[in-house]
């Protein structure tokens, strides 16, 4: 169903609402657990719905880069590439171009929505590209499939990911496995990967409600679980193909948190230009594509 710019997909178990005009974001992801409806992701705020602002959504795609680009530039093929700020409160560009665009609906059915957009190198990321995001409803959740295509005549560096916002209950627990964590100290931030120590091990699960962190993990194996015991629900995340990094952001003073499957480290363009290995940055030639999928599925405890 299409309602005020929202495209709603649902079945007896779950439902989502896609916002083409708000960066191909989601307005909600809800599940029927027992006799009640539970918000699996933070519902879009009223202001975000009015303003078509993905920042206040349930989830948005990040492309053609993820998180921040330090000081708004990077060097590629020996050329300094400027990337303008896209957030008024931050001098550095943030989370790519896609979440700021109004997307076109390419295909729509009861179970699937396909959205497309084109990046203008004169206004944002300094390379020409086409992006496609597909949301497909499943019996227990939905899948997100992202495709990036280089429309230019030169190789294009790129990264992508998804940025969901989750409710932070007092008992929320997250479980995932990673091989390393990117350093927090120094300028620019997060410029070295270190082997994961016990403080950063989440494979057995950790309660995160009282944590404060903004951390990128490398060597992410693609599987994660978020459990809300008080809501009697668990979310399983399965990230495929290129999603070998993840970012966990938690603030003790906020009632939401994010766990973001991504293809690269934070500020990866600049890290790679300095010869740092393992950043996850990809380079695609003219006409070439990169694509990856993330699955979200809900189960009752």
PLM-predicted stretches and their roles:
Residues 1-12:
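Short, Gly/Pro- and small/polar-rich lid/capping loops
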Residues 9, 20, 33, 117-158, ...:
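Acidic, contiguous internal or C-terminal segments within carbohydrate-active enzymes
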Residues 74-82, 146, 282-299:
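Short Pro-Gly-centered flexible turn/kink motifs
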Residues 82-83, 155-156, 165-241:
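Active-site/ligand-binding surface loops and adjacent short beta/alpha elements
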Residues 8, 79, 84-139:
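Extended, loop-rich substrate-binding clefts of extracytoplasmic carbohydrate-active enzymes
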Residues 33, 75-79, 105-113, 136-141, ...:
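A short, structured loop/turn motif at beta-sheet edges
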């Amino acid at each position: 169903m299409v309602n005020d710019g929202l495209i709603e997909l649902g079945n007896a178990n779950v439902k989502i609402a896609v916002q083409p005009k708000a960066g191909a974001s989601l307005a909600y992801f809800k599940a029927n657990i027992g006799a009640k409806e539970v918000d699996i992701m933070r519902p879009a705020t009223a202001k975000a719905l009015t303003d078509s602002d993905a920042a206040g959504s349930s989830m948005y795609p990040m492309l053609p880069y993820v998180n921040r680009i330090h000081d708004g530039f990077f060097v590629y093929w020996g050329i300094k590439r400027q990337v303008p700020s896209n957030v008024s409160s931050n001098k550095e560009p943030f989370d790519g171009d896609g979440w700021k665009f109004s997307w076109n609906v390419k295909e729509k059915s009861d179970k699937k929505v396909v959205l497309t957009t084109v990046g203008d190198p004169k206004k944002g990321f300094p390379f020409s590209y086409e992006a496609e995001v597909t949301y497909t409803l499943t019996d227990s959740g939905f899948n997100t499939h992202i495709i990036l295509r280089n429309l230019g005549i030169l190789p294009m560096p790129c990264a992508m990911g998804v940025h969901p916002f989750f409710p932070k209950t007092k008992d929320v627990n997250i479980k995932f496995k990673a091989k390393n964590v990117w350093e927090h100290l120094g300028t620019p931030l997060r410029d070295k990967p270190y082997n994961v120590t016990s403080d950063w091990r989440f494979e057995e699960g950790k309660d995160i409600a009282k944590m404060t962190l903004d951390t990128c993990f490398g060597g992410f194996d693609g599987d994660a679980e978020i459990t809300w015991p008080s809501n009697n629900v668990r979310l399983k995340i399965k990230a495929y193909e290129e999603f070998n990094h993840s970012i966990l952001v938690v603030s003790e003073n906020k009632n939401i948190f994010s766990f973001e499957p991504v293809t690269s480290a934070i500020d990866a363009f600049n890290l790679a230009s300095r010869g740092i290995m393992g950043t996850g940055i990809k380079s695609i030639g003219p006409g070439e594509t990169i694509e990856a999928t993330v699955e979200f599925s809900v189960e009752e405890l």
